[in-house]
A protein has these predicted regions:
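Short loop segments at secondary-structure junctions
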Residues: 34-36, 120-122, 140-142
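Active-site catalytic loop in hydrolytic enzyme cores
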Residues: 1-61, 74-83, 150-153
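Aromatic-residue detector
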Residues: 1, 6-7, 12, 16-17, ...
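Short, functionally important structural connectors and interaction interfaces within domains
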Residues: 14, 41, 131, 143-146
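Short secondary-structure boundary motifs at beta->alpha junctions and helix caps
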Residues: 1-4, 134, 141
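CN hydrolase (nitrilase-like) catalytic-core segments centered on the catalytic cysteine
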Residues: 49-135
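Short, well-ordered beta-strand micro-motif
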Residues: 30-32, 117, 136-138
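A short C-terminal boundary segment appended to hydrolase-like catalytic domains
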Residues: 142-164
Length: 164
């Protein structure tokens, strides 16, 4: 489910109003793939990337890989795309797999592209750039455990009071 709909007015005048066409989802999803070992994959969509608690919840419930299929614009993509994905990888200690639309669309919109695969340490392992192509890399799930042991932010998180 895409939980957060993209209803924004960007500084360049672009307006996106997904709520006019779509309804939001209400459930965070983790799929389990049965292989030699179980692999847990958290699923998010596009604008969800801007809500770190969703990613932390997925990781807290066992996600080792989180997918983020997206269509970032040429306005937000160059300054936000890599940064947000790397931050979510680092915060959660998960691999991030982010397929992204690229190029010009019939409706006149342009998408930034840059399908990415990012390690739990925040390293970009594969980047498609603006190309229409297939990217891949070897994912060693042992890296998830290593990253989470090195920086145990998921276990260190504390609830706190506010004075506002």
């Amino acid at each position: 489910d895409k939980i957060h709909l993209f209803d924004v007015k960007l500084p360049n005048g672009e307006i996106f109003k997904e709520s006019e066409t779509y309804s939001p989802g209400y459930q965070a999803i983790i799929a389990t793939i049965e292989q030699k070992n179980k692999i847990k994959i958290g699923m998010t969509i596009c604008y969800d990337i801007r809500f770190p608690h969703l990613y932390q919840d997925l990781a807290q419930h066992g996600a080792e890989i989180i997918t983020v299929p997206s269509a970032f614009s040429n306005t937000t993509g160059p300054v936000h795309w890599h940064t947000l994905l790397q931050a979510r990888a680092i915060e959660t200690g998960c691999f991030i797999v982010a397929p992204a639309q690229t190029g010009h669309h019939q409706c006149g919109r342009n998408s930034f592209g840059h399908s990415l695969i990012i390690s739990p340490w925040g390293e970009v392992l594969a980047d498609a750039g603006k190309d229409v192509c297939f990217i891949n890399t070897i994912i060693d799930l042992g890296e998830v455990k290593k990253a989470r042991l090195a920086i145990p932010s998921l276990k260190s998180h504390k609830r706190y009071l506010t004075n506002f």
